[in-house]
Every structure is written in C-alpha cells, then in structure tokens.
Amino acid sequence: MAAGMKAKRSRRRKERKNVEHGCAHIKSTFNNSIVTITDSVGNTLSWASAGGLGFRGSRKSTPFAAQMAAETAAKAAMEHGLKSIEVYVKGPGSGREAAIRSLQAAGLEVTLIKDVTPIPHNGCRPPKRRRV
C-alpha cells in the first residue's frame, strides 16, 4: 500500500429485524434506571439508561430521567416494527411507573405488566442503615 493510505474497513451494517411483539425490561434502582427492549426470544432490539442520556448524580434516579430513557428505547425499537410489548419491572426505584407510562405514550401497546423484583429468602446480609 502507498504511504499515508489507510486500509478501508468494511463494517457490516446492522440489519433491521421486523418484530411485532417484544418485551421491555425496566430495571429501576435507587441510583439509575435502565430500559431494555427485546424480542420475544430475548435478543436486544434497543436499550437506554438515565445515565447514558446525560443525567448525572442524583438526577439519574428521578422519574423524569426514567421517562426519557424509556422514550428513547421505545423510539429505537419501533424502527424494528415493534407494536406491542410485555413489561417486566425490576427494582425499588422511583422511575418504575414513569417508564411504563412513557412506553405507552410512545405508541406501544402494553399487553402485560409484571414485577420481577428478586426477593431474597434470607440470603445476603443487606447494607447497613444510613446515618445522616
């Protein structure tokens, strides 16, 4: 190759799947909210988090940040032809309801809402109480 020429890298373009029905997994913790939209098998179509959208610190854990994350993920998933979703919510955070409402407002039909928060049968010792 001649000096100064770069080798052209061929990158495969991501193909658009045509999925009508999928699942939305909302993980809402005390610090952040993550929304992942998958097809019915579990392959990820799109995802977004409050931190990834530029919310930092205590603003990441707000319902508005979760709403924006759900909206962003829904718009990206609807490019794959998604029309209806089942929603699985995990965690104790404040953005749970806001994210579900945002998915509905984006134009997705919610067929099921299920809480899949893991509950220990006296497993690990919880963190110590905060003293403020």
From Swiss-Prot:
Keywords, sorted A to Z: Ribonucleoprotein, Ribosomal protein, RNA-binding, rRNA-binding
GO MF annotation terms: rRNA binding; structural constituent of ribosome
PROSITE patterns assigned: RIBOSOMAL_S11
GO biological process, one term: translation
Any one GO CC term of the record: ribosome
Domain of life: Bacteria
Keyword Ribosomal protein: yes
Subunit structure: Part of the 30S ribosomal subunit. Interacts with proteins S7 and S18. Binds to IF-3.
Family listed: Belongs to the universal ribosomal protein uS11 family.
Function: Located on the platform of the 30S subunit, it bridges several disparate RNA helices of the 16S rRNA. Forms part of the Shine-Dalgarno cleft in the 70S ribosome.
UniProt protein name: Small ribosomal subunit protein uS11
Encoding gene (name): rpsK
